[in-house]
Amino acid sequence: MALTFVMPGALREFSGGRGEVRVGGAAHTAGEALALLWAECPGARDRVMNERGEVRTHINIFIDGENIRHGGGLAAPVGDGAEIIILPAVSGGQAPS
C-alpha cells in the first residue's frame, strides 16, 4: 500500500523540499502511517509530535479530508492509497477595521 503525505512548507526542510512524500508499507492506523513517514523524514517527528508521543495541539492531521482528532486520533483508520495532510494551525494577523 502506498500513502501520500502532503507536507506543509514548515516541514519541507525534513522532506528534501518535497511537498508530497509517498511511502510504502502496511499501515492500518494514523499512528502506523506516521511511523512510516518518520522512517522517511525522521526530523519531522519532533515538529508534529510532543514528548508524550501525541500530536501537538497546533498541528492538524487529515486522512482523506477527515481530521483525526474527530475520528480516533492516532488510532484513526487509514485506507489503501490514503492522502494524509499535515497542517499547522494558522493564527495572528489583525482584525479588519
PLM features: residue spans?
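Ubiquitin-like/PB1-type beta-grasp interaction modules and other compact soluble beta-rich domains
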Residues: 1-97
